[in-house]
Every structure is written in structure tokens, then in C-alpha cells.
């Protein structure tokens, strides 16, 4: 089947239409390509196909620096120019707001701002995670492929911080060596690096039980020279694993990053944006939207380890910060101490069940990919907040929630700003500014 790719989807595929009008999601193609494709799924309203030959390459198709583009799932847009990536992400957000949020095109044109981004196309990630697999009887490490059931073994990744070119290869080599004489029980391996603090942490995720601590720490220290080596022990069913303990094997036992006006120290299980410069764009947009004053009260929902809590605490009289994940709560308390901030009430628990009793002048919410529960929107509306910033990592749930906010009626949308935190992928962050009517 000959197809011309019209656009990029919110996913790895290009979008085309067959002669019969059906939408076709095409693996291995980018917008502007003309390809020969083989149909792998023919549904009632759409088809899926994979590229067998590129008949005429798109002017936006590039030769990526990574040989695993199209094989590994980590950089699914790696063969598309950055300019085209930015345009596609902005367009995907716009179309999602129209399709799911039911916003009129003219509303979208008025609200959506030009996409913000850093200059770094590659080498921007401060964290990389590897999955174990067995190759020829030996444990090897890799990443989920385009086919998520497969692991693509790698010992380098151009997305990882380029100031640490040997870190990934050294860790992979050390663990491959150790696996020859020890059953490490590895479930995954995380590596975090900071070009600002020079911190390098290796986190080994394993079940509870016996573990060759001294050998692992010695071999990893000799190979990669990390500032921290930790073991994260988890238990429970595979789809509901939870952290039971973090054990320091060597070094500091945590990872440190300088961001915005302060410093954050994070334990291995805690979430932190993988693009530090991109996270600073988010902070700037949130502070610009809220314009917090020194006599005001702020609420930070789903606050994590303090990405927005810390800058709010420097600007406001008092902050109530709510977070359900235990390791992040502990990290937030430690980060407040490190930054000498004592005007924050840290509330451990679900954002709806533990919604702060205090009122708010400004409020920021940064929920997980699932977005906000309707109850959360009602609770936010019940405050006296003059301005609200909503940080989202999923355009679909964002569009759904924005529709709910508009229908609820307390707040009006001011602007919606996409942010490219993840070059070479289809993912996009968004910062939304609401103002009380």
C-alpha cells in the first residue's frame, strides 16, 4: 500500500489515509514521507501498518545520531527534525483540545502559546532506566523497544547527559560482569547524572532478600566512579510493586541537582523531571502565571520533592504542599531543610482526601498522567485562589480537565503553553494559567 504521511500522531506513528478514507497509523514513517507500507491490522475505522520502503523521504526526515531509532522505544521521533517535532507537538495539543476539550478552533488559537523549549536536541536527560534481559545465558541491560515486549540491549544512549559519555557503558559492563558470578535479581537499573553538581547515582531495583552488597558496590565504584550507589527493594505483585526499603551501598545515598534558585536532593524512587533545563522553564511559567507575593498563601498539590514548592516558599508567606508518595514526602522535608525554608506545611496523603484546610491566594497542581478527579476540581474551585497553574504531562487528560474547569465556572482560562521537555519523543508538557472570574 502506497501512503503519504500527513502528520505525526501523539505516539510513534505517522498518520495517513487509505484510498477508502480510513485513517492509517504507520510505524517507521514521519510526516511528509511517501512510503510503501504493509497492513498489520485492519479495523472498522482505522488501520495499522508498518513501513516496508521509503519511496520519497520527507524534507523533515533526518539521519539521527543513534542507530537504535526505530528499534528502541526511547526516541521514537529521532528521525524527525526538531523544527518539525515542535510543530507537531503544538498541533497535537491543539487538536486534542478541540477533539476532547470541545474548544472551538478560534478559542484554541487565542489560548495556545508558541511552544517553549531548550536548545538541547540530544544529551538532555539526567536519568536513564535500563531493563534486564538474558542474552546467550548472560544478563544484559537495555531499553524497551518499539515492540514493548522486547528489550533492546544498549551500552550507550545519545539522549543521556553528554557530560557523562562513559557512565552508561561502564555501569552496563560492570553489571554484566557481576551477573556472571552472582544472581543479582535485577528488576531495573536507574542512572542519574547532573552536569551542575557532578553527581552520578546508580540505583539497582531488586526484590527483598540476600544480595552481594560489597561485591556490587566495589565493582560499580571501580567501573563508573558514582557519587552514590543504592539498592531499591520492592515487593508485591508485578503490576503493583511498591518500594519497601532503600539501602545505601556506597557514597551519599542520594542524588543532588541544582535547579532554579536552589538545590534538590532526591532518593532513587522519587520523581524528578528528566530534563533539568526544561524543568526550569516549567518553574518560570508557573511563577509567571501565579505572580506570588510575599504576604500570600500558596497551595501546591501533587508537589513531589518540591520542584514548585521551593520557589513558592521563597516568594510567599506560607505554602501548604500535598504529596501522597512517601519517598517524595521525605525528600521534600529534607530539601526544605537544605534550602533553609521553614514556611511550608508538608502534608502526606492524597490531594483530595488531604486537601489543605487553609485557603489559598495562588495554587499550583501537577497531577500524574491520569489528571484530576472531578472532586479535585471542585475543591480547587472552593478556594479563594486568584490564580491557578495546572502542569500536565498528558494532552488528553488535560483537555478533559480543562473542559471540566470551564463548565464548573469559577475560573477562566488565560493561556495554555506547551513545553518540549522530551525532544526526540512525542511527549509534551503543558502549563495552563487560570484566573478567577
Name each model feature, range by range:
Residues 1-68, 98, 148, 345-347, ...:
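Terminal RNA-binding accessory module
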Residues 10, 211-437:
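Rossmann-like S-adenosyl-L-methionine
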Residues 36-38, 129, 299:
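Hydrophobic beta-strand signal
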Residues 38-42, 131-135, 192-196, 435-437:
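Short beta-strand micro-motifs enriched in acidic
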Residues 52-64, 70-184, 196:
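Extended interfacial segments that mediate partner engagement and assembly in macromolecular machines
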Residues 113-120, 187-192, 417-422:
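Short, solvent-exposed loop/turn elements at beta->coil junctions and helix N-caps
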Residues 126, 200, 295-296:
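Nucleotide donor/acceptor-binding cores
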Residues 190-194, 198-210:
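Carbohydrate-binding surface patches
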Amino acid at each position: 500500500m502506497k501512503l503519504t504521511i500527513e502528520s505525526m500522531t501523539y505516539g510513534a506513528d505517522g498518520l495517513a489515509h487509505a484510498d477508502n478514507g480510513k485513517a492509517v497509523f504507520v510505524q517507521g514513517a514521519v510526516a511528509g514521507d511517501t512510503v510503501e507500507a504493509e497492513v498489520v491490522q485492519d479495523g472498522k475505522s482505522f488501520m495499522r501498518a508498518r513501513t516496508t520502503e521509503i519511496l520519497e523521504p520527507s524534507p523533515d526526515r533526518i539521519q539521527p545520531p543513534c542507530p537504535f531509532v526505530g528499534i528502541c522505544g526511547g526516541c521514537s521521533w529521532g528521525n524527525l527534525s526538531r523544527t518539525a517535532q515542535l510543530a507537531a507537538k503544538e498541533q497535537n495539543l491543539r487538536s486534542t483540545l478541540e477533539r476532547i476539550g470541545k474548544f472551538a478552533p478560534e478559542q484554541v488559537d487565542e489560548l495556545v502559546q508558541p511552544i517553549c523549549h531548550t536548545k538541547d536536541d540530544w544529551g538532555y536527560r539526567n536519568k536513564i532506566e535500563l531493563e534486564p534481559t538474558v542474552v546467550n545465558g548472560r544478563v544484559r541491560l537495555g531499553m524497551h523497544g518499539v515492540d514493548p515486549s522486547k528489550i533492546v540491549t544498549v551500552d550507550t544512549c545519545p539522549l543521556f547527559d553528554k557530560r557523562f559519555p562513559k557512565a552508561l557503558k561502564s555501569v552496563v559492563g560492570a553489571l554484566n560482569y557481576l551477573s556472571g558470578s552472582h544472581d543479582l535479581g535485577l528488576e531495573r537499573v536507574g542512572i542519574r547524572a547532573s552536569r551542575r553538581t557532578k553527581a552520578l547515582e546508580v540505583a539497582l531495583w531488586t526484590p527483598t532478600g540476600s544480595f552481594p552488597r560489597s561485591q556490587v558496590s566495589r565493582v560499580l565504584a571501580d567501573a563508573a566512579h558514582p557519587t552514590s550507589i543504592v539498592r531499591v527493594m520492592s515487593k508485591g505483585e508485578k503490576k503493583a510493586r511498591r518500594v519497601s526499603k532503600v539501602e545505601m551501598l556506597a557514597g551519599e545515598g542520594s542524588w543532588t541537582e541544582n535547579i532554579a534558585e536552589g538545590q534538590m536532593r532526591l532518593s532513587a524512587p522519587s520523581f524528578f523531571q528528566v530534563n533539568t533545563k526544561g524543568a526550569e522553564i516549567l518553574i518560570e511559567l508557573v511563577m509567571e502565571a501565579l505572580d506570588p507575593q510575599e504576604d500570600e498563601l500558596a497551595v501546591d498539590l501533587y508537589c513531589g520533592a518540591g520542584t514548585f514548592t521551593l520557589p513558592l516558599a521563597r516568594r510567599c508567606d506560607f505554602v501548604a504542599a500535598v504529596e501522597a508518595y512517601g519517598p517524595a514526602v521525605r525528600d521534600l522535608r529534607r530539601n526544605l531543610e537544605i534550602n533553609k525554608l521553614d514556611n511550608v506545611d508538608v502534608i502526606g496523603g492524597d490531594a483530595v482526601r488531604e486537601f489543605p484546610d487553609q485557603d489559598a491566594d495562588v495554587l499550583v497542581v501537577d497531577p500524574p498522567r491520569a489528571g484530576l478527579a472531578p472532586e479535585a476540581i471542585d475543591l480547587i474551585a472552593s478556594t479563594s485562589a486568584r490564580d491557578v497553574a495546572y502542569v500536565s504531562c498528558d494532552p488528553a487528560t488535560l483537555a478533559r480537565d480543562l473542559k471540566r474547569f470551564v463548565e464548573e465556572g469559577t475560573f477562566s482560562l488565560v493561556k495554555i503553553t506547551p513545553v518540549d521537555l522530551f525532544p526526540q519523543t512525542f511527549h509534551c508538557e503543558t502549563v495552563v494559567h487560570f484566573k478567577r472570574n
